[in-house]
Amino acid sequence: MKKQKLELTWIGKEDRPRLEPRILLEDQDLSYHSGYRVTEEDLFDNRLIFGDNLLALKALEHEFSGKVKCVYIDPPFNTQQAFEHYDDGLEHSIWLGLMRDRLEIIKRLMNNEGTLFVHIDDNELGYLIVLLDEIMGRSNRVAVITFKQGSATGHKSINPGVVTTSNFLVIYAKNKPIWTPNRLFTARAERDKRYSQFIMNYESHFPKWQF
């Protein structure tokens, strides 16, 4: 990676795993899809991949490089706890290296209008943002959304320290100048009498709205 004026460094940053080209093999016993298409837009190319996610990303790169529109990842929060299926207590430099290796491939998979969502808590939030600024570009950071993940009840209510109830979604665009979010509207069964005006052409860009 090209050196920048401002960057996050850690022990072992220059160490890179050697990734050979990989292929994905279908397990016919576990595969299933409908025998027919309901519409012409139906897709039969969804995949559930079992294995190391770094190797899986590498295997997808040849076919999907520059094509992925949306990526959502939920990496280990590095809470210093040991769970049944994975260790969530990695040393910080190891965690950063693992994240860097995967995020670099994810960036190559994304198309120019793509969006990346990373779900994280406060343990590594600060380091993650700086790492993503370096990989995706600080100018491509869209937002950091805070959402309520829990409540100060139960065992948390007797915690003598600060109680954490929030998680975060860190959002980056592949190329923010051409990135456009999809607007979401919720239909109402009846007219909301609090409003006296209606947008007649809400599908248009907002400067062209007619009331």
Tell me what each language-model feature is:
Residues 1-72, 79-94, 98-101:
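DnaQ-like (DEDDh/DEDDy) 3′-5′ exonuclease domain used for proofreading
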Residues 77-78, 122-125, 149-152, 175-179:
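Conserved nucleotide-binding/hydrolysis micro-motifs of P-loop NTPases
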